[in-house]
């Protein structure tokens, strides 16, 4: 059996198809983040982009996400050094930090079911930006399993 591509290739050398398949579809990228102006610390909220389908954890207009979702961030190979803002469970970040993919990752399990069962997606855990008055009320504390591994 051959070595999985994510273990044998650097992020820079992956094909577009391989790159896209790294995304586990958790939906955490689609949550709004707030930055502390004094410390530059990033805080995750449970406030989702209006384009996120909270049941499937995917964009309602994925092919056009960079034009229809003006705040949607495109992850590129050129930005690898800046991936520290990504969730600590994100494959792009993990591989950039030379860490293994989590055991529930769809590339390992073959489906998103294990990710949802492990509670690693935003499925049914979000509110939409249109319904939010005070965004700071929606800051989420990261559980220990999502904190940086040192």
From Swiss-Prot:
Q: Which Pfam families match?
A: CxxCxxCC
Q: Which HAMAP family does its entry note?
A: UPF0260 (MF_00676)
Its family remark reads: Belongs to the UPF0260 family.
Q: Which NCBIfam families match?
A: PRK05170.1-5 (NF003501), PRK05170.2-1 (NF003503), PRK05170.2-5 (NF003507)
Q: What is this protein called?
A: UPF0260 protein VIBHAR_03078
- Give the source species: Vibrio campbellii (strain ATCC BAA-1116)
Q: Source taxonomy lineage? A: Bacteria, Pseudomonadati, Pseudomonadota, Gammaproteobacteria, Vibrionales
């Amino acid at each position: 059996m051959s070595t999985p591509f994510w273990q044998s290739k650097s992020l820079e050398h992956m094909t577009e198809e391989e790159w896209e398949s790294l995304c586990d579809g958790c939906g955490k990228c689609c949550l709004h983040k707030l930055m502390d102006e004094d410390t530059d610390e990033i805080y995750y909220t449970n406030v989702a982009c209006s384009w996120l389908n909270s049941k499937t954890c995917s964009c309602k207009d994925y092919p056009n996400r960079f034009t229809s979702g003006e705040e949607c961030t495109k992850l590129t190979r050129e930005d690898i050094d800046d991936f520290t803002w990504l969730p600590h469970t994100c494959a792009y970040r993990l591989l950039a930090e030379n860490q293994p993919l989590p055991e529930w990752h769809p590339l390992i399990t073959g489906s998103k079911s294990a990710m949802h069962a492990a509670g690693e997606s935003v499925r049914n855990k979000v509110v939409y930006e249109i319904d939010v008055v005070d965004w700071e009320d929606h800051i989420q504390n990261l559980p220990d399993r999502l904190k940086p591994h040192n």
